[in-house]
Curated annotation (Swiss-Prot):
CDD domains: RNAP_alpha_NTD (cd06928). This is DNA-directed RNA polymerase subunit alpha. The N-terminal domain is essential for RNAP assembly and basal transcription, whereas the C-terminal domain is involved in interaction with transcriptional regulators and with upstream promoter elements. It comes from Yersinia enterocolitica serotype O:8 / biotype 1B (strain NCTC 13174 / 8081). InterPro entries: DNA-dir_RNA_pol_insert, DNA-dir_RNA_pol_RpoA/D/Rpb3, DNA-dir_RpoA, RBP11-like, RNAP_asu_C, RNApol_insert_sf. The lineage of its organism: Bacteria, Pseudomonadati, Pseudomonadota, Gammaproteobacteria, Enterobacterales. Pfam families: RNA_pol_A_bac, RNA_pol_A_CTD, RNA_pol_L. The keyword Nucleotide-binding does not apply. NCBIfam families: PRK05182.1-2, PRK05182.2-5, rpoA. Residues 1-235 are annotated as: Alpha N-terminal domain (alpha-NTD). One of its GO terms (molecular function) is DNA-directed RNA polymerase activity. The keyword Transferase applies. The gene is rpoA. GO terms for biological process: DNA-templated transcription. GO terms for cellular component: cytoplasm; DNA-directed RNA polymerase complex.
Amino acid sequence: MQGSVTEFLKPRLVDIEQVSSTHAKVTLEPLERGFGHTLGNALRRILLSSMPGCAVTEVEIDGVLHEYSTKEGVQEDILEILLNLKGLAVRVQGKDEVILTLNKSGIGPVTAADITHDGDVEIVKPQHVICHLTDENASISMRIKVQRGRGYVPASARIHSEEDERPIGRLLVDACYSPVERIAYNVEAARVEQRTDLDKLVIEMETNGTIDPEEAIRRAATILAEQLEAFVDLRDVRQPEVKEEKPEFDPILLRPVDDLELTVRSANCLKAEAIHYIGDLVQRTEVELLKTPNLGKKSLTEIKDVLASRGLSLGMRLENWPPASIADNE
């Protein structure tokens, strides 16, 4: 085997043994020594905790107010029924939340096949038993909420946020969204030509049937690759803060003195002194304005009152006045 001593081996063989529709064994080799556990543990954790899926989150059963009760004519108690519903395997297309209904009467088992749903929902294991009716006159009706999520979310984590709005009789269920039911990996020895210190990673997994095992491995690897992508170039993934540029001058200073609606006499006196903008005016002092021909104390008082109503005054100092936009116009 030719190659640099610092060059890492890349897996060249990926073998997928489909034991059943829900059970598969994936073999990956060759791997550098130690990489079997590195990749195997990472993929195992992602498959168990980060895979998206659908799960039962709430149940309403007619005649049942709380989970610590029983229902006449039903063999199982309510806690056992909720536990059975927790194992319901559902595939939902195009929606994040659906409501399923179940109505059954007469002696016999109540299974997932008895659930009524629309075309966007598929019950993967219709033979899954929910409960048993033990009397000809017994019946059971329930509404089942199925939501899309990720990982495992216990009912206790949702109690505080939903307690105020949750009516009596609506029972919360621990939501196990992950479609992966069992995952285990093993690292075996591998050999390539003269090298005998290599790893072979064998991953064995079972799903609830809502996802193909091969697709589950592919999604987990994609999630891992996306999380590591930021480290490739060590780039900063944070969005840069956009700082708002504050204008150099208050917009009111850039408006013409005509906007002050002064008397004709006062306005004409200011224009005669080349005071065209409010910014020009506020930089003048009272003494300077009184030297303006035909502008007396009455006009000065008027100007001061108008400026004060806008939060301005005479004798202000403005750095870098006039701005380029005004200077160019002049």
